[in-house]
Amino acid sequence: IVLRFDDTDTRVKPPLLEAYRWIEEDFEWLSGRRADIVIRASERMPIYLKQAKKMIEGGHGYVCRCEAEKFRKFREGKSDCPCRERETAESLEDWGKMNSGEIVEGGAVVRVKTSMGLPNPALRDWPALRIQHSPHPIVGEKYKVWPLLDFQSAVEDQKQGVTHIIRGKDLMDSTRKQTLLYEHFGWAYPETLYWGRVKVHEFGGFSTSGMSSSIEEGDFDGWDDPRLPTLRALRKRGFEAQSLIS
């Protein structure tokens, strides 16, 4: 069994250092065994950066220097961003500057080249990597360019030989984005199954980000607060792991 942490967002949803241990403990409690392999994406950054450079070199991606609002207008108008038409060498030069710190945070992103005329706006030259200078709890300030989840998890799935993906219906666009990325690299995309939004009668709808905000605002005492639907909270309330599995 592989336990994987997709932890490459250092600013918007920065990982909690203690959460790595909590999740491993929760996994062992629920499954009755430790994970055979624990993968932290933050410790595999060279793989993602190498694949990103390969994508640019192959003409399947480019470095975009447009401001977010400016690119949004290009996307809405189904028109190509000027950066898209630059020579590969120019994008590679900017790629080097992104990694060296010469380009500031927000000054550039790497985009996957799809088509700006696609019906679904989310798929039009979607962002794959961006600059983030916030320190990471495990690797600190070692990297300046970090992959977004759709790129990182897609590459990791292929490297790990994943054949089936089970994800929420709200991530259908992730499947569509990653399928386009796999086509660029000549990879076969895994079979994907979906579930609906999870609701527990007592708690209604919930999300990790929503619970995190509520904890920060003092509405809950922590991730093991008995009022939350987390494994740590259920365990604290006296639930047996087998009752959740059954």
How should these model regions be labeled?
Residues 19-44, 51-54, 58-61:
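A glycine-rich helix N-cap at a beta->alpha junction
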Residues 1-3:
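Histidine-anchored nucleotide/phosphate-binding helix
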Residues 15, 19, 44-47, 144, ...:
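Secondary-structure capping and boundary motifs in well-ordered enzyme cores
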